[in-house]
Every structure is written in C-alpha cells, then in structure tokens.
C-alpha cells in the first residue's frame, strides 16, 4: 500500500511539475529563447509520458538472476497483462528517450557556442528521428510478447497466484535489453556532460574581457548541465539495485521496490534545472527582477557569426 502511495505521489509530482515547466517554455520564454524552448518542451513532454506510464503500471521488478518477474499493481491491471507489458515497455522507452534528448540538448548548447542556432523545424525533425529507433525496438518486443508464467517462479518469489505477474523468456530478455540500453545511454549522457563542460570552460577563458553579466552565462550553463547530471545518476542507481538483485547481492524483498522508484526521480527532478537556473522562469515564479541583456532574436542558422567569437550572449538564457 505504501509503495503504491509513493509511486502515485512521485508520478503526480512528475506530471504536474513537467506540465508547469512546459507551460513556462511555451508561454513565458523570451523570443531569444524560442528555439531552446522547443528543446525544453520536448524534454518535459517525454517526462510527462514517462511519469504517466509509471503511474499506469506501478510495477515492481523482481529477479534472482535465473528469471525476471514484473509485478504491476497500477491501473493497467484492469486492462490485462498485455496492457501492463506495453506500459512497462513504454516507461523504459520514454526513460531512454529522455536521456537521448538530454544528450541532444547538450549538443544544442554546443552548436550555439559555435555560433549557430538550429531553427524550430530542424529541432522537431531531430526529435522525431532520434525517437524512431526506440519506438521500433519497443514495438518489436510488444508484438512478440507471449502470456507465459511459471508457478514455480511465483512460489520462489513468494508471490500470490492471484497477483498479476509478467514473466517468461520475453520478459527476461526484453528487460535485460532495455535496462542495458538505459545504462549505456546514461553513460553517454555523462560523456556529453563532460564534453560540454570543457567547451564552456574554454568559452569562459575567451570571455575574459567581456562585461560581467555576460561572464555569468558560463556559470549558469555549467549549473544547469551539472544539475542535469543528477538525472542519469538515478538511472545508474536503479540499474545498480537491479544488478545487485540479479547477482543475489541484495535480497529481492528489498530491491523490488527500489528500482522503479529510482527511475521515477529522473523525470521528477528534471524541470527544476530550468526553474532554478533560467532567469526568465525564476523571475516569473518568484517575481524577482533579473539583470539580463536585451538582445535581438537569432536566426535559424547564423553561419555569418564568427565561430570563434566569444561574444555570444544570446545563450545566456539557456
């Protein structure tokens, strides 16, 4: 009961906080931030979907190395096992895409540092293209799902036979595959963070003679990027707990509740990076004036802007 309550609260907070952040991105972003507001909107939309799927399934993931059992306890149980398995796959897929888009947002910052800004249409196309592999992979697993479970497995994990459980070869290999992909994507997100941080440090050294308010952009960018490093950390923690159960270093009676909860903290915490560190959003929430430069909106792409020019204040807002 407590697990379901905790799951419900985290899911609700994730949905509401990301919906609020999406509203800020769409309605309260300055014109200079129009392109980046699309990045934020896609990110928060993915987080809303991940939180919704988490609430829909409310799953416990149990393993002892020889088998993997998913025990859904959410609203999906009213629609059958196939619906719960689809929700399980959708949640993992959205978490993976969330990390992929996090990497994309780091690369977006880098393109701006290089004096180029992608237009909205290109950003939407990129978002669609990077989502295709995850959707195809997830669709294949769902299409070959077979309703199978073993009573011996249920008794071994102490699960009542009247509980809805998902088990079998498809559950085992699809979970292993997607969790491995999550781990690899989280590692790539850390690599992307390291790359953008080094780029920002070089950019800061070039700004040694620029006025103070523009120097602050490096610190803001680093703070946002560092805060977002928390997101793959939750994925790492959830996968670590799963591996500990898989290798029998951790009793499944404790680990089964931790994996999904750790995953949920990633979409829950994501919007606060923008709320805390982006001046315009903070100003709207707290009603405080922010000292930001007045700038003209950038073009879709500005190759005429010198790539090595350190004076690129329009990324101050990001």
UniProtKB/Swiss-Prot annotation:
The UniProt entry, under Gene3D superfamilies, shows: Rhodopsin 7-helix transmembrane proteins
> Which spans are transmembrane here?
5-25, 38-58, 88-108, 126-146, 176-196, 226-246, 258-278
Topology of the protein relative to the lipid bilayer? Multi-pass membrane protein
Subcellular localization, as worded in the UniProt entry: Membrane
Pfam families reported in the protein's UniProt record: 7TM_GPCR_Srd
This protein's UniProt keywords: Membrane, Transmembrane, Transmembrane helix
An annotated GO cellular component of this protein is: membrane
- Which protein, by its recorded name, is this? Serpentine receptor class delta-25
Q: Per the similarity annotation, which family is this? A: Belongs to the nematode receptor-like protein srd family.
Under InterPro entries, the record lists:
7TM_GPCR_serpentine_rcpt_Srd, Nematode_rcpt-like_delta
Keyword Mitochondrion assigned:
no
